[in-house]
A protein has these predicted regions:
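Short, polar loop motifs at secondary-structure junctions
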Residues: 200-202, 426-429
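Conserved core of the PLP fold type I
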Residues: 131-133, 138-269, 281, 287-295, ...
Length: 442
C-alpha cells in the first residue's frame, strides 16, 4: 500500500499533492512498469481522504500517460523513460519559486476565499471524461469566437429560469473571467468617455478601466448603493455597478434606486450600465431581487457573470451579454478575437449546467455559506457594540466596522502576525482614506 504524506492545510489541493507524489515515485523509479496502484477505495481509506480525491489524482496520471487502465483490474504503471541525468543538471539553477508568492495563513478571511468542500470533484471529473470520450476529436478544432453556442444556450436557459432574464445567445460572449471581459468592454466604449464607478469598488475593474488612461469618476455610496445625484452631476457615459451585493460593502440596491439609474442611462443614446451580477446566487433573507438587466427596457445594460465565484476560482469562465448597440461595435472591432476558454472546459460546464448539477451545487453551496455566515455573525456578536456588521443578508462576505483605538492598518497587521488574513476597506477605495472597516468571507 502506498504511504505518502499529504498536508490538509495547504494551498495546493489534496488531489494535486497526491498526483505529484505518485508521479515522483514513478519518475524516480520507485514504482516501475507493471506495478499496480492501490484501488481508489483502498488508498482513500489508508490516507483518510475521499475516494474522489484519489480518483482525480489517478485521472491526471492516466491523462499524462504515467499509468494505464486495465479493464476489471485497475491502474498499472506505464513504461517511462528516465530523463537523462546530464539534462537534469542543466536545470539545477532554476529556482522553483513563485514570482509573487502569497504568504500562507491559518485563517484566510479575504473576501475571495472560497469553501473548497463544496466543489463537486467527482461529478466534474466524470463529465470531463465523458466529454473527452464523446466529443474528443471535435474539441481539438477551433470553436466559435464568442464561445461555443451550446454553452451560451445553456447559460441563457439558466439565466431565464433563475434570474428571470431573457437573453439572446448571439449577444453573449464567453471569456476567461470577468477581468478579461472587462478588457474587451474597455475597447467597445468610446475611449474619451468617462466611466463612473461605485466607491469603494471592485479594484480589479478600476485597474482595468484606468490602465489605458481612461478617466474614471468615483461615485459615493449611501445606504441604498450608488448615489444617483452624484451620477447625474458627472459627465460619465457608463457606470459600473454591483447591485445584487455591492462589493465590498454588501449593500443590496433596491428596485427604486435601480430604476433611477436606468432612467439616467435612458437620458442619452450613448450611456450604458455595466452590471456585474456579483454574488447574486447567495441571498439568505427574502426573495432574490431581479438584476437590472431584467427590467432594462431600453437595451442599456451590459450584464456580466462568472462561474469562478460559484464553482471554483480555477474555473476561469465568465460571460458578458452586450446590448445590441455595443454588439455591433464588438463585431466591427473585435470579432477576430478567438475565445479564451478551452473548448473542453466549455463542454464540461455545458453538461454541468444542462444536467442540473450546477443548480444542485448552488443549493448545496448556499447552505454551506449560510451556515458559515450565521456562525461568523454569532461569533462577532460577542464584541457587543464594538462591532457593527453590514451587508450580512447576502453574498459570500460581509463588512465589519470596529470601534477600536486602532487604525485599520494596525488591526490588519496584528491579525497577520497571528496567522489571520483580513482585508481593510481602504484596499477597495479609489483615493486614500483610512477606515476601521474589514471585509470578511462567510
Amino acid at each position: 500500500m502506498l504511504t505518502v504524506e499529504l498536508k490538509s492545510r495547504h494551498k495546493m489541493p489534496l488531489y494535486e499533492q497526491l498526483y505529484l507524489k505518485i508521479r515522483g515515485l514513478i519518475t524516480d523509479g520507485e514504482l516501475t512498469e507493471g506495478d499496480k496502484l492501490p484501488s481508489e477505495r483502498g488508498l482513500a481509506a489508508n490516507l483518510q481522504i475521499s475516494r474522489s480525491t484519489v480518483g482525480l489524482a489517478y485521472g491526471q496520471l492516466y491523462a499524462e500517460g504515467y499509468v494505464e487502465v486495465r479493464p476489471q483490474s485497475g491502474y498499472y504503471v506505464n513504461k517511462i523513460d528516465k530523463i537523462n541525468s546530464e539534462k537534469k543538471e542543466e536545470f539545477t539553477d532554476i529556482k522553483n519559486e513563485s514570482v509573487n508568492p502569497e504568504p500562507e495563513y491559518e485563517y484566510d478571511f479575504s473576501p475571495f476565499s472560497l469553501c473548497k468542500e463544496s466543489f463537486p470533484y467527482r461529478m466534474w471529473d466524470r463529465l470531463y471524461r465523458q466529454c473527452m470520450r464523446d466529443k474528443g476529436e471535435e474539441l481539438f478544432n477551433l470553436g466559435e469566437r464568442q464561445g461555443d453556442l451550446e454553452l451560451r444556450v445553456a447559460i441563457a436557459k439558466y439565466l431565464f429560469g433563475y434570474r428571470g432574464l431573457i437573453i439572446k445567445p448571439e449577444n453573449m460572449i464567453i471569456g476567461a473571467g470577468t477581468g478579461y471581459l472587462l478588457q474587451l468592454l474597455e475597447h467597445l466604449i468610446d475611449e474619451k468617455s468617462i466611466i463612473a464607478m461605485e466607491n469603494p469598488t471592485y479594484m480589479q475593474a478600476y485597474r482595468i478601466f484606468s490602465s489605458l488612461n481612461r478617466k474614471v469618476q468615483p461615485i459615493n455610496l449611501d445606504e441604498n448603493g450608488l448615489r444617483v445625484d452624484e451620477l447625474n452631476l458627472s459627465e460619465a457615459k457608463a457606470v459600473y455597478l454591483t447591485p445584487s451585493h455591492q462589493f465590498p460593502t454588501g449593500v443590496v440596491m433596491p428596485i427604486k434606486r435601480r430604476k433611477e439609474i436606468l432612467s439616467w442611462a435612458a437620458g442619452e443614446d450613448d450611456r450604458y450600465i455595466i452590471e456585474d451580477d456579483h454574488d447574486s446566487e447567495f441571498r439568505y433573507k427574502g426573495l432574490p431581487i431581479p438584476p437590472m438587466k431584467a427590467i432594462d427596457t431600453g437595451n442599456k445594460v451590459v450584464y456580466l457573470g462568472t462561474f469562478s465565484r460559484t464553482i471554483a476560482p480555477a474555473i476561469r469562465i465568465g460571460f458578458m451579454v452586450l446590448p445590441d448597440g455595443l454588439l455591433k461595435v464588438y463585431r466591427k472591432k473585435l470579432a477576430f478575437l478567438a475565445c479564451t476558454v478551452p473548448r473542453i472546459d466549455q463542454a464540461v460546464l455545458t453538461e454541468f449546467i444542462l444536467g442540473g448539477h450546477y443548480e444542485r451545487h448552488i443549493n448545496k453551496a448556499r447552505k454551506i455559506y449560510k451556515s458559515r455566515h450565521d456562525k461568523l455573525i454569532s461569533s462577532l456578536k460577542v464584541f457587543g457594540d464594538k462591532v457593527k456588521i453590514m451587508g450580512g443578508n447576502a453574498g459570500m462576505h460581509l463588512m465589519v466596522k470596529f470601534k477600536l483605538d486602532m487604525t485599520e492598518e494596525e488591526v490588519v497587521s496584528r491579525a497577520e502576525k497571528s496567522g489571520i488574513k483580513l482585508v481593510g476597506l481602504s484596499k477597495h477605495r479609489i483615493g486614500a482614506v483610512s477606515y476601521t472597516h474589514l471585509t470578511l468571507p462567510t
